[in-house]
Structure formats: C-alpha cells, structure tokens
Amino acid sequence: MRAAAIRPSVAAFAFAAVLLLPSLAARAYDPNALWKIVNGECVPNQVAHGDPKPCAEVDLKNGVEHGYAVLKDLHGPTQYLLIPTQRIVGIESPELLAPDAANYFADAWNARTFVEKAIGRALPRDGLGLAVNSKLARTQNQLHIHVDCVRSDVRATLDKLRASIGYAWAPLAEPVGGYGYWGMRVMGGTLAGHDPFRLLAEGVAGARDDMQLRTLVVVGMRFENDAPGFVLLQDRADVLHLDFGAGARLLDHDCALAKNNARPADAAGAR
C-alpha cells in the first residue's frame, strides 16, 4: 500500500524535474548572447569596415532582413553556427514560414566550407550535417543552425536506411543516434528550392502548431546512381522519455570522420 501511494508522488517529482532541466540550464547562459554578438558586433563591423569579426562571415547582399552571419561556436574545433541577421527567436518563429523567408538551411549548407577549412580537407557530403534544436533544448533565443561533422554511427545508420527513405515524411525503420526520427529525402546538390522549415510545417501533421517542440536535422547524402541529395530528419520533443528535441546531438564536434574517413571526398562542385 505504501509503495503504491508513493509512486505517483515520485513520478510527479521526476516529471517536474525533467520540465525544469532546460530552464535551469538556460540560466547558466545569457540567452541573448548570440544576438548581441551578431547584431551588436558582426553586422556593424561588416557595414562600417567590411570586416565581419568576431564572425567568420556576414552576408547582407539581400539586406539585413534576409542576411546571415557565420560564427565559430565555442564547443569543438569544427562547429560553426549560421545565424540570421534579423531577429528570429527560434524554430517556432513565424518569420521562417513567411512567403519571402530566406532559406537559412541553404545558406548553412554553403557554410560547411568553414568546417572543412577547420579540418584541413574536404569531406564527402554524407559526413556533414546541419541541425536546429527545439525550444526545450536550446539555450539561445536567436535562431542558429549548427553546422558540423556527422557522428560516425549516425552516418552508418543513415547509409543503411538510405534506400528506404522516400520523398515524404515517414517514421524511420530504426532509431538514429538512439532516438526515433521521421525522415524524408530531397534531391539536388544544394538546398536551393528546398526549405526544411517549410517542408516540416507543411508535411507533418500538427507540426505547424507545435514547431517549438520540433528539431530539424539535415545530412548530405548520395542516393541511387550517385545522385546528390539530402536526408531530412525531424523529431518532436518528449520530456517524459527524456527527449528534448536536440537534433545537434547527431553531430560530432570532435569530427571523428575527419580522422577515420576512408571514403574520398566528392568532387568540388558537386558536394
């Protein structure tokens, strides 16, 4: 009797603790740090002096409203962040689904060259990935796309699942990196014409209404007949199962692939 009475209280306490974890972690950071760097330093320096520092790049050719900055992340030698130069809080921001929205994932894929420069050589397209975390998993209130190497085990799983991944969102046959994801493929050497934010909101039932709980990951891939494309992955945060929707967990900030990769890099214009 006593044990049965205690269990609900323990479960409730555990659930409350799980809900608090992201907010407690966020308090250790300034949630506006990225925005202050981009808006307060990188953009003004680029405009005034043609120098994006402390960012690696600032692109304003389409205006601040559609521009972006590339910033070296503090974690890992190869990780970079693609950050809009307009104020966009996160994956749930309606600006990302506006008719004239910039395709930040396409810009992030182009920014993979910074990762390769940090490594010192090119990687095959399936060795590079992009990720946006859910609201529960992030510590910054400015949209940022993680750009880095893909974990070796994640690469191996996607390689195995590649033929079964279709052109519409569907649950994958097995977990990726220890978590269940939905996946789809898009074809092309770049993401021009394919906006993952829009594909998620329009292609997964209910996603448009709870984008704050979603995480998005994009991994380069080669499909049948060596055709270039991408695998898109999405997951919905589930705190009861300790899944906060942290897609960046599929990336490897130590880039073991750069040390162990035996496959040749793709030809320079087709990656």
Where are the predicted features?
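N-terminal secretory signal peptides that target proteins for export/translocation
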Residues: 1-6
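Bacterial N-terminal signal peptides
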Residues: 11-22
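HIT superfamily nucleotide-processing domains
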Residues: 27-271
